[in-house]
């Protein structure tokens, strides 16, 4: 489906809607954050948030959601290699519950994040980013990969309807 007036529209149920999504790579110390462009086609690294507890983080992210006109939030789920939800995954699920209350009625989508940090590191190395700079931006780059993966799959599902 072609862009219309700078926005990419996705079919949702029986209606079309524009998508502006925020992607999160939730870690124990930081949260990498990415945002789609206004057309809803490409994900871009945005920032890294130092963790301030689930409630504080949810409040900060809710403000970003409002400020950027976000319609969907995508959270990377750290599944184990077996596909099961482990300790880290349960921590992320707890965060999702707190975030969901802060951004209601927006929907939160979970996206498998296995290997995204390794892929983000590979991308940054190929771009000849220094080790010190990589450390500062790896989480937001991983968030962008998580978000782009979800966006591509969502577009494909939507266009095939």
Task: Tell where the protein language model's regions lie, with residue ranges.
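Phosphate- and other anionic-substrate recognition elements at nucleic-acid/protein interfaces
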Residues: 2-22, 28-161
């Amino acid at each position: 489906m072609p862009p219309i007036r700078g926005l990419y529209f996705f079919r949702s149920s029986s209606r079309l809607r524009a998508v502006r999504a925020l992607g999160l790579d939730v870690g124990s110390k930081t949260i990498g954050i990415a945002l789609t462009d206004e057309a809803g086609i490409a994900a871009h690294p945005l920032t890294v948030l130092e963790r301030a507890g689930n409630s504080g983080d949810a409040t900060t992210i809710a403000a970003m959601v409002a400020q950027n006109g976000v319609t969907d939030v995508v959270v990377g789920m750290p599944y184990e290699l077996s596909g099961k939800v482990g300790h880290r995954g349960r921590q992320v699920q707890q965060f999702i519950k707190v975030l969901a209350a802060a951004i209601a009625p927006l929907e939160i989508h979970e996206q498998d994040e296995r290997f995204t940090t390794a892929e983000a590191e590979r991308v940054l190395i190929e771009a000849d980013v220094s080790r010190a700079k990589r450390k500062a931006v790896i989480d937001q780059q991983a968030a962008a990969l998580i978000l782009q993966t979800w966006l591509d799959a969502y577009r494909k599902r939507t266009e095939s309807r």
